[in-house]
Amino acid sequence: MHIAALHQPSQVQLNQDGNLKHFLTIEGLSKENLTKILDTAQSFLDDNNNLINRPLLEGRTVMNLFFENSTRTRTTFEAAAKRLSANVLNIDIARSSTSKGETLRDTLWNLEAMAADIFVVRHSSSGAAHFIAKDVCPKVAIINAGDGRHAHPTQAMLDMLTIRRETKKSFEDLSVAIIGDIKHSRVARSDVAALQTLGCKDIRVIAPNTLLPVGFSEYGDHVRLFNNMDEGITGCDVIIALRIQNERIDSPALSSQSEFYRMYGLNKERLSLAKPDCIVMHPGPMNRGVEIDSSIADGEQSVILKQVTNGIAVRMAVLALSMQGQLQEQGLIEAIAL
């Protein structure tokens, strides 16, 4: 997908009142939409960063449909749904009827007939979640848990919540560096879109040319490209390290992993170029000794494990808000008391 195409707004995910009914992509959502997600997620965390259970989805059924492997995302969605008192079903795609030749459309229609309220979908095809929400199951709340190289909106929102909680600064005042495989990363696309929407004016993308997407220069005035990592991270408030997406690379993009670490690996020496209170993030899974050194991943400036906790809160928020938006759309309720 040409990166400029991601700026086309998608109103499929909003109901007639402008509230979330699906969560498919950051693009097309306003600052107010994103802030509502962050504020709702914040309400599920106490002052000590402990999660707060609320039975907002009691009697509702959430189905996790992961057509790609996942550990953190699937598990945190399950944890989020259970903390909202939902019934959770994890569909084993490898053993489902899709492996027997059934179409995706027929599989989803059958699952919808089982009284599913929310589908959490991860798929290797870009646009899969949008297709399901628009053309297959519009009355089921569809949450995009990652579609190809396109988008990973809940990861972006948990990253934004982590940045907001840990830096205690306005997004307008932050310098954020994203380092690694930008070309194949749905996280990078969604993070950049969320940062732009929330007002960040200094977004630095650091990568070799072979790991940058076509059309990068069209992404926005506040996004700058750096091939030199030392230059790119100097004075940053936030560093987000990304792994190399080997499973999505068709032809060799690097001479070796050791060469990537030498040029772009985050170590103590490089981190010292950022601000003293710079936080270090990573969406996982990490490849230690490739994009990040263990001393940094496990160090005092790392907030990687806090991202995981924040991910549950964000996914609780997205599940609750999307269910509310669907019920509003269908004229069944005015609002859930969030």
UniProtKB/Swiss-Prot annotation:
UniProt keywords, alphabetically: Pyrimidine biosynthesis, Transferase
Keyword Transferase among UniProt keywords: yes
Pathway: Pyrimidine metabolism; UMP biosynthesis via de novo pathway; (S)-dihydroorotate from bicarbonate: step 2/3
GO BP annotations listed: 'de novo' pyrimidine nucleobase biosynthetic process; 'de novo' UMP biosynthetic process; amino acid metabolic process
An annotated GO cellular component: cytosol
InterPro entries tied to this protein: Asp/Orn_carbamoyltranf_P-bd (IPR006132), Asp/Orn_carbamoylTrfase (IPR006130), Asp/Orn_carbamoylTrfase_sf (IPR036901), Asp_carbamoyltransf (IPR002082), Asp_carbamoyltransf_Asp/Orn-bd (IPR006131)
Top-rank EC class of the record's enzyme: transferase
Binding locations of L-aspartate: 100, 186, 243
UniProt EC number: 2.1.3.2
Keyword Transferase: yes
Binding site for carbamoyl phosphate: 72-73, 122, 152, 155, 284-285
Cysteines engaged in disulfide bonds, as pairs: none
GO molecular function: amino acid binding; aspartate carbamoyltransferase activity
Catalyzed reaction equations: carbamoyl phosphate + L-aspartate = N-carbamoyl-L-aspartate + phosphate + H(+)
Pfam families: OTCace, OTCace_N
Family membership noted in the UniProt record: Belongs to the aspartate/ornithine carbamoyltransferase superfamily. ATCase family.
Function description: Catalyzes the condensation of carbamoyl phosphate and aspartate to form carbamoyl aspartate and inorganic phosphate, the committed step in the de novo pyrimidine nucleotide biosynthesis pathway.
Self-association and partners: Heterododecamer (2C3:3R2) of six catalytic PyrB chains organized as two trimers (C3), and six regulatory PyrI chains organized as three dimers (R2).
Protein name: Aspartate carbamoyltransferase catalytic subunit
Organism this protein belongs to: Acinetobacter baumannii (strain AYE)
Lineage of source species: Bacteria, Pseudomonadati, Pseudomonadota, Gammaproteobacteria, Moraxellales
This protein's encoding gene: pyrB
